[in-house]
Amino acid sequence: PMQHYENTASPRGSRVDGFNPEYGAPTLPTVEILREMMDEKDLWPINKEVWDYLDGNGFHLMSTMYTDLVNNYGKSSSIDEFAQKGQLLGAINSKSIWEVWNYNKLDYGDRFCSGLLFWYHNCSMPQVASRMWDWSLEPTASLYHTANSLEPLHAQFDYLKNTVSVVNDYYREFKNYKVIAQVYDINSKKVFEESAVVNLPSDGVVNDALTIRFPENI
């Protein structure tokens, strides 16, 4: 997902410049839906032949790149654990696409972006490469994080710059709005807080309103 921020997500070139007519990212279905698709013996350890067939028999990303990315959260010992981590990855996968577009909306960011079409929202057949909801109409974490990223007034975090930006999709301006960033450690102790007052232009963005400084020992 960090490749979306760097704009290196595709060897075909830029994916978040101008108007993008087709963009998408997979999300692993929930473990209950995976169990509807295949026998338990093919779920874990992952049977690559079966998973690749259920990946559209073309991209084969779920048994390769997606699995490698899920393992960044630590090696899994069961399909239940793997599927749960897969939801985390799917969430940030979709969130990063929308928030990068937010940041670069029109003339406000590092590069001009006038829009993108997300392909696709649902699955037309049982697939391990699900989207916002799957063949059984079961929503994934991608749906909720997409909805969050596209709320009309949205504060968002840039994972590469450690900055917070605020997006306004309303056709009216908002003045003297306060954005607050807080960081908590693993024990839910607040270790950082900073705020900034922003004037949001109509259908515009205030980028890098504040910078989060993460404590070294967090």
Predicted features along the sequence, with ranges:
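Substrate-binding clefts and catalytic carboxylate motifs of secreted carbohydrate-active enzymes
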Residues: 3-175
